[in-house]
Design a protein with these regions (language model features):
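Hydrophobic adenine-recognition pocket in adenosine-nucleotide-binding enzymes
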Residues: 6, 105-107, 141
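Active-site rim helix/loop that mediates acceptor-substrate recognition in acyltransferases
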Residues: 15-66, 73-75, 80
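Conserved active-site alpha-helix within GNAT-family acetyltransferase domains
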Residues: 130-133, 140-165
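Acidic/histidine-enriched, glycine/proline-rich intrinsically disordered or flexible terminal extensions
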Residues: 179-228
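Glycine-biased, low-complexity coil/linker segments
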Residues: 89-91
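Glycine-rich phosphate/pyrophosphate-binding loop shared by adenosine-nucleotide-utilizing enzymes
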Residues: 1, 67-73, 100
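A short beta-loop-alpha structural element at the N-terminal edge
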Residues: 2-14
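Conserved acetyl-CoA pyrophosphate-binding loop and the N-cap/start of the following alpha-helix
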Residues: 102, 110-111, 115-123, 133
Length: 228
């Protein structure tokens, strides 16, 4: 496998990959491919951290021959944290503090649980740190993301919007890529608006979704809001 920056020629393939990776995972169907489609023109999008993982097969033993199939993708976004001024000792006096997030991160279903997602993420985190990105927060499964250095965001005094500040939020994770970047601060995070584009523009999303092959939407155990 090789990891490289996404190119315009990859867009449709990557969106289809994202759709396959998230279909019926968190809800019947998915919207992550539309989020990605719209995010590329969002000022919060970070093109230098827009990576694809491309399949490679062995050629004559001296060089690899790329067959062109993309099996993984991850994108990053600028974000911010609203500072809780009474508890922030960094001299900020309230306001907001720059941070970053990432996602969707997608691995084709045929390649899941084989280590490719962690390999892609770790590569991207190294590049993010090289760019000076000091803090990441995101929503995800700590069972997976702990292997890339993430822990509960509450341990860094970062709270999730609309959730009680005195409770740990098991899906809200964070990591300081640059030690001390977030020292002596406390604040509340709300995901960037770009992640809600499908909810805010349902007709546009449905028109976009109609350009893909039809797939069955299923209500399954483990999805958000699932009830027996």
């Amino acid at each position: 496998m090789i990891i490289r920056l996404e190119e315009p020629k990859d867009y449709r393939e990557v969106e289809n990959l994202t759709r396959e990776a998230f279909w019926n995972v968190y809800r019947p169907g998915c919207t992550e491919h539309y989020v990605l489609n719209q995010y590329r023109t969002n000022p919060d999008f970070i093109p230098e951290l827009d990576f694809v993982m491309e399949r490679q097969r062995v050629g004559d033993g001296t060089s690899g021959i790329i067959d062109g199939r993309i099996i993984g993708h991850v994108m990053f976004s600028k974000a911010e944290i609203a500072l809780d001024s009474p508890h922030s000792q960094g001299g900020d006096g309230g306001g907001s503090f720059p941070s970053w997030t990432f996602g969707p991160i997608s691995i084709h279903p045929d390649y899941k649980r084989k280590g490719y997602g962690l390999k892609l993420l770790n590569y991207a985190l190294i590049k993010a740190k090289e760019m000076g990105i000091g803090l990441l927060q995101m929503e995800g499964n700590i069972g997976f993301y702990k292997h890339a250095g993430f822990d509960l965001a509450s341990k860094l005094n970062i709270h999730y919007h609309d959730m009680p500040k005195d409770e740990d939020v098991p899906f809200f994770l964070a990591q300081e890529l640059i030690p001390g970047y977030w020292s002596n601060r406390e604040g509340t995070y709300c995901p960037p608006k770009g992640y809600f584009v499908a909810d805010e523009n349902p007709e546009a999303f449905e028109a976009y979704e109609a350009t893909f092959p039809q797939k069955e939407k299923l209500r399954l155990p483990g999805q958000l809001g699932y009830e027996e």
